[in-house]
């Protein structure tokens, strides 16, 4: 490298090169729980055509006339209940940053690899971190959307945004995207370990465990989105790894939004029905979420637990996401090392 630099003309701008970037990307987070921060975040999120596939002529009047005037306050209150007050940020941001920092440490045997992190919506943006990696000398970037199961509304929109960032670059790094890893044995083992460890910490045994995945509209599935199948495959492999009968572990879908039908069974309706049918003890895990966030901490640990208890259930426990735990990092590192093959 020094020989190449020595042959550059004196007036040549400084050029960094020879590095490989790894960019971890999660969904996103507001900068704060106030109305303005929430509205800015929701506007970016809900304006994405991958998330809401309705006609803009139909959707924008609803978004700007109703949703962005009513939802920021409600969602802000929900975020405030699970906010990381010590760092004044969402736990999703905390965990994603921790994952990137720990990943960098675990890859010290690859000195030319630079690890960074970004959010699809909010800050730090994908473009800002890709620009930073390129300026740091990364001629190749491994883009890692932190979603074990592929969906157009999650993985694809991260890829879209990354390729959009390339449009602004004169010297474009080579870009490689990480595929889904819903059936990765290391991932399945980590989920099984987390379930077994959590249940061992309880003084009661759940009658069944729900694996609650984020839902998508049924219409997206009918158009060819593989997400539904990959969620069920993860659930099946996890149940087999645990050695449980079919009735012990159930796949459900949460977080539906709007009037159309989403993937079923719905998590909230399921926990209510289970309680009314006489089930007294359940636990819920969120295999599709790499990190705990609003949808796991508030919607499941909070709301779903309340629904279960109000309907007659007695014991409810939420199993934390893998986050930046040793098992969680082992999963991410395994994927990164595999996808970096041929580059480092």
From Swiss-Prot:
Pathway: Porphyrin-containing compound metabolism; protoheme biosynthesis; protoheme from protoporphyrin-IX: step 1/1. GO terms for molecular function: ferrochelatase activity; metal ion binding. The keyword Glycosyltransferase does not apply. The keyword Metal-binding applies. Fe cation binds at residues 214, 295. GO terms for cellular component: cytoplasm. Keywords: Cytoplasm, Heme biosynthesis, Iron, Lyase, Metal-binding, Porphyrin biosynthesis. It is found in: Cytoplasm. It catalyses: heme b + 2 H(+) = protoporphyrin IX + Fe(2+). Its EC number is 4.98.1.1. GO terms for biological process: heme biosynthetic process. It is an enzyme of class 4 (lyase). HAMAP family: Ferrochelatase (MF_00323). Catalyzes the ferrous insertion into protoporphyrin IX. Belongs to the ferrochelatase family. This is Ferrochelatase. It comes from Allorhizobium ampelinum (strain ATCC BAA-846 / DSM 112012 / S4).
């Amino acid at each position: 490298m020094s020989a190449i630099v020595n042959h550059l003309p004196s007036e040549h701008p400084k050029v960094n090169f020879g590095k490989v970037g790894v960019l971890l990307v999660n969904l996103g987070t507001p900068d704060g729980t106030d109305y303005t921060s929430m509205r800015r975040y929701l506007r970016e999120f809900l304006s994405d055509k991958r998330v809401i596939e309705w006609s803009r002529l139909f959707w924008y009047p609803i978004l700007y006339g109703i949703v962005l005037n009513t939802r920021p306050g409600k969602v802000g209150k929900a975020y405030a209940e699970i906010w990381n007050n010590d760092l004044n940020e969402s736990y999703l941001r905390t965990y994603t940053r921790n994952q990137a920092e720990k990943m960098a440490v675990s890859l010290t045997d690859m000195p030319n690899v630079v690890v960074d992190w970004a959010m699809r919506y909010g800050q730090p943006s994908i473009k800002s971190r890709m620009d930073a990696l390129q300026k740091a000398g990364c001629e190749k970037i491994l883009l890692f959307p932190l979603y074990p199961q592929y969906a157009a509304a999650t993985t694809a929109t991260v890829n879209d945004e990354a390729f959009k960032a390339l449009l602004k670059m004169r010297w474009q790094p080579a870009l490689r995207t990480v595929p889904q890893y819903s059936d990765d044995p290391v991932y399945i083992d980590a989920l099984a370990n987390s379930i077994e460890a959590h249940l061992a910490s309880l003084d009661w045994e759940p009658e069944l465990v729900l694996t609650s995945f984020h839902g998508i509209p049924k219409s997206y599935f009918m158009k060819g989105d593989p997400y539904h199948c990959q969620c069920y495959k993860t659930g099946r492999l996890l149940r087999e790894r645990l050695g449980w009968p079919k009735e012990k572990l159930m796949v459900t879908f949460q977080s539906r939004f709007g009037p159309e039908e989403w993937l079923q069974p719905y998590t909230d309706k399921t926990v209510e029905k289970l309680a009314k049918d006489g089930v007294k003890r359940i636990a819920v895990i969120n295999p599709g979420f790499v990190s705990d966030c609003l949808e796991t901490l508030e919607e499941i640990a909070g709301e779903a637990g309340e629904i279960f208890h109000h309907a007659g259930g007695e014991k409810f426990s939420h199993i934390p996401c893998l986050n930046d735990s040793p098992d969680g990092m082992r999963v991410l590192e395994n994927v990164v090392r595999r996808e970096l093959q041929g580059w480092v």
